[in-house]
Amino acid sequence: MRPHIHIPDSLMRQFIGIATLVASSAMGAQQPVAASKAPTLIRNATVLTVTKGRLENTDLLLQNGKIAQIGKNLAAPAGAQVIDATGKYVMPGIIDPHSHTMIDAVNEGSLSVTSMVRVRDVLDPTDVNIYRQLAGGVTTINVLHGSANTIGGQNAVVKLKWGRDADEMLFPNATPGIKFALGENVTRKNSQQAQQASGQPLRYPATRMGQEEVLRDAFTRARDYKAQWDDYNARVKKGEKNLVAPERNLELEPLVEVLEGKRFVHAHSYRGDEMLMLLEIAKEFGFTVKTLQHGLEGYKIASEIAQAGTGLSSFADEWSYKIEAYDAIPYNVPILLHHGVVATVNSDSDERARRLNIDAAKMIRYGGLSEDEALKTITYNGAVQLGVQDRVGSIEVGKDADVVIWSGDPLSVYSSAETTFIDGEVFFDKQRDLAMRDQMTKERAALEAADRGRRPVVP
């Protein structure tokens, strides 16, 4: 039997106070701004449209979730919230083409091909990194499966609507995608060291040769599966009776969608030779790789990538953290853009995602990009890579009202995101955040003061 422990009243009050403070801090800092249907008029800002240049002293009207008007001296609709943005900048919401935010176990690495698993099934809408990335001006992310196997799971394109259910965050009608992976991450998963550490048996493939075979085998099976369904559907259309449909295969269905151009391939890769191999496989089976992810040696084969109609999403200045990253250079993205490749900068990190604006600025330093070209690497080009450029990525009338007000030029280290809108609703407001922090500090001080000096109760 456990002994009875008496806790003095003063100590109990202190425990309760601390627990209350922790709970209120966690919930208060994370509560989204209440949804508002009222229009918002942003006045007198420097508007970085990305696709149509810089507009000085310009107004922006957000209404019904869209960018309704752009111009000078716009009239405020009845009931509109008016924000004076004099001296401030407005740009499109940042798009991160490679993220693992909202998911914990990113790899279903038990098989070489796991095209049947879906990231959308495990999205965590309470991940605090959503809020932190909103504070960095990010509005849309491409949540990808990990890179442990040659053909991984299906991705999810997400709008960071903090405080909403996961289903409400899914980008409506975004083209679905799937994650592929080449190189060291796949082979390391199957190394002797990994086997000893996990106690699991080795899984094929263990070499780049094996990765190529896995791809060719998977698409051969997918092509045959597609042919079976095409034949069945054709016979049904002719009116034939007593037909038996092919058995449904959840592994091959997404790969058939790739063959039909209905699903994008986002392929983790580093070395030029392995990227060329994948482009050859795609050519053999008649599909296009939408993006090469990371692609640190992309500059070596920029012409071939452009000819294939493939995009590339890279880091601004990450290299030499593993052997296949040794030949990376900071000029990778500018060189690719020069060759006509739709290139972007991604984070692959909850932390770096909050500073993608600074990564874009590095493209000006390393490669001499213009302001618009640099901003496109974190906005419009990412929208193209995800197939949502008609909705987001630039400030144009009719597009989704995913915009960010910055304290200054977003390409400056001295600037910060002040207000982040998604579909015209505020999901991050810096002044509200600071006021909440101040309130919590005062609450803590009051709780400590209430207990300070009290004499403990002796049992």
Range-by-range predicted roles:
Residues 107-123, 164, 177-181, 186-197, ...:
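Active-site gating loops and adjacent loop-to-helix segments of metal-dependent hydrolytic enzymes
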Residues 10, 30-31, 37, 419-459:
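Extracellular/periplasmic ectodomains of large secreted or surface enzymes and adhesion receptors
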Residues 31-36, 47, 51-91:
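Histidine-rich, glycine-flanked metal-binding segment
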Residues 85-156, 164:
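Metal-associated gating/positioning segment near the N- to mid-region
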